[in-house]
A protein has these predicted regions:
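N-terminal targeting signals for export/organelle localization
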Residues: 1-63
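A short beta-strand-turn-helix
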Residues: 57-58, 65-86
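Short, small/polar residue-rich loop motifs at catalytic or cofactor-binding pockets
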Residues: 62, 83, 163-165
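Short active-site neighborhood of thiol/selenol oxidoreductases, capturing the structured segment around
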Residues: 76-98, 104
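Hydrophobic beta-strand anchors of alpha/beta hydrolase catalytic cores
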Residues: 86-87, 119, 168
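Structural microenvironment flanking redox-active thiols in thiol-disulfide oxidoreductases
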Residues: 98-142, 152-159
Length: 200
C-alpha cells in the first residue's frame, strides 16, 4: 500500500476525531449541573434600583410576574396567594451574598417567617467556574429552608432592576413593590421588614 495514502488516511482519521470531539465539547449545555426548566417573565419591567431615592421611584409599582425552576427542576410561579413576598436575589460568587444567607436563615431558624409572608431566594448571575457553583449546592450547604428559584439567564433579575447583590424586593399581597434594598442587611432589619410586610 502506498505510504502517502496511509499517512493521508491517518490525518483524515485524526481530523475526524478532533471534529467529533469539538462538536461534543461545544454542544455541552452551559447550564450543566443546574436545575432545568424555562424561565418566563411577563409585565412591565421595574426601573433599575436607584439607591436612597428608590422609594420615590419604585414604591407601588406592579411587579413583573415570573416562573422559574426550583432546585428540583419544578417550575414555580410568582402568584397572588394572599401572602406578601420577600424576594432575595443572590449571586453565588458574591461575598456579600455569602454573608447574607446565614444571617437570614439564622433569623428564620430562631424566629420563623412571619405569618402572611413568603420568602423566596432567587439565584441569579450564575457563572460556571465561580465560587459556590452550582448554587443549589451552596444553598443546601447553608441549610436554606425557604423557596429557592434559579434565574438561569438573569431574566428575572433584569426585570426587577437588579444592579447589585444581595438585592431584596418586598411585595405586598397584590404583588406591588413595598420596598427594595441592596447590600447586607442585619438580622434585626431583615426581621423588622418581614414583620412589617406581614402586617400590611
Amino acid at each position: 500500500m502506498n505510504k502517502n495514502f496511509i499517512i493521508a488516511g491517518a490525518v483524515i482519521l485524526v481530523l475526524g476525531l478532533a471534529i467529533a470531539i469539538g462538536v461534543t465539547l461545544s454542544s455541552e449545555p452551559v447550564a450543566a449541573g443546574l436545575p432545568e426548566g424555562e424561565t418566563t417573565v411577563t409585565g412591565d419591567l421595574l426601573p433599575e434600583f436607584a439607591g436612597e431615592n428608590d422609594d420615590n421611584i419604585a414604591l407601588g409599582l406592579a411587579a413583573p410576574i415570573f416562573s422559574a425552576p426550583n432546585e428540583n427542576s419544578e417550575i414555580v410561579s410568582l402568584e397572588k396567594n394572599g401572602n406578601a413576598k420577600a424576594l432575595l436575589f443572590l449571586a453565588h460568587g458574591c461575598g456579600y451574598c455569602q454573608k447574607e444567607v446565614p444571617v437570614v436563615q439564622g433569623f428564620i431558624d430562631s424566629v420563623g417567617v412571619p405569618p402572611g409572608v413568603d420568602v423566596i431566594a432567587i439565584a441569579t448571575s450564575i457563572e460556571r467556574g465561580r465560587e459556590n457553583y452550582p448554587p443549589q449546592k451552596w444553598l443546601a450547604d447553608e441549610g436554606w429552608s425557604e423557596t429557592q428559584l434559579y434565574d438561569l439567564d438573569r431574566e428575572i433579575g433584569n426585570a426587577y432592576g437588579l444592579s447589585a447583590s444581595p438585592y431584596w424586593v418586598f411585595l405586598d399581597k397584590d404583588l406591588n413593590v413595598v420596598a427594595r434594598r441592596t447590600g447586607n442587611l442585619p438580622a434585626d432589619m431583615v426581621g423588622a421588614l418581614l414583620i412589617q410586610l406581614g402586617n400590611q
